[in-house]
Amino acid sequence: MSRPGEHRVVHTLRTQAPARRLYELVARVEDWPAVFEPTVHVQVLERGPGTERFRIWARVGGRVKTWTSRRTLDPDTLRVTFRQELTQPPIASMGGSWEFRGDGDGTEVVLTHDFAAVDEAALPGLREALDANSGKELAALVALAERRQPPEELVFTFEDTLRVPSGDDAYAFIERSDLWQERLPHVRKVTLTEEAAGTGPAETRDMTVQDMTMETVTTDGGTHTTRSIRLCVPARSIVYKQLVPPALLSGHCGAWTFGEDTVTARHTVAIDPARVEEVLGKGATVADARTHLREVLGANSRATLRHAAAAAGPAS
């Protein structure tokens, strides 16, 4: 039962997918940016038996919001409960649960939110945002769980680490994506807007949030346009989420992490198996798609880093 001043909304969806598979997908919070459309980035802060604490950045009503949550995971009852520890206005408190109720006809997924608002006038907007994001999350979860292939074949992560003359200079090169059309031969045009995060934990308060639209030239001479949200922490990291992934993917996110003289480029992708043959040709498999993505995305990151290293000049 909700406490005084607290409100409850419940979203449900039935699926033929097994309950345990659905539970395990929700439990893997690191994969959320590649699976759930609203989620931009997740940083795990603590993890212990049956509990974890993480910071999340997500798009809510077209803006990027951040909060810190603690979760309890029960693999026996297939239940995940959560509670926000650090909220942002207009939310005063937020918690809830994921439940997966299997029966002979499939599984009912139940996503519950209990929340209170700083100002009651904000309630309609909060309900609208919860309805929109919860609907997207349930649809994406069920779509992935109902695939014939195991989720671990479709969602995977890979990374490359390269040495550079200066990690700080490499950060400056990659952060200034508005100059890429002058610096990278495959980039035709970049449109960039940015704003300071301004809120959240002290260690990320100097973060900037970038909205980047980029037009690139493909190997066959055509053009391809992508749009990404990027979270930039000076000299440390740039994480990103593609809002409209390429045709082969249902989700794509990644990160650039900078050391003193190294940069690591990481990609997490979710393959759309229904598009594999359309993109790669008749008879192509998910395994072929994994190889293709590893080669193409990895090559793009390495090429960007080589240009960044060249711009920085030789190591002193």
Curated annotation (Swiss-Prot):
Recorded hits in InterPro entries, A to Z, give: COQ10_START (IPR005031), START-like_dom_sf (IPR023393)
Species this chain originates from: Streptomyces coelicolor (strain ATCC BAA-471 / A3(2) / M145)
Its biological purpose: Is needed for correct cyclization of the oligoketide leading to isochromanequinone formation.
UniProt keyword annotations, A-Z: Antibiotic biosynthesis
Which domain of life, per UniProt?
Bacteria
What name does UniProt use for this protein?
A: Actinorhodin polyketide synthase bifunctional cyclase/dehydratase
From the UniProt record, give the pathway where this protein acts.
Answer: Antibiotic biosynthesis; actinorhodin biosynthesis
GO BP annotation list: antibiotic biosynthetic process
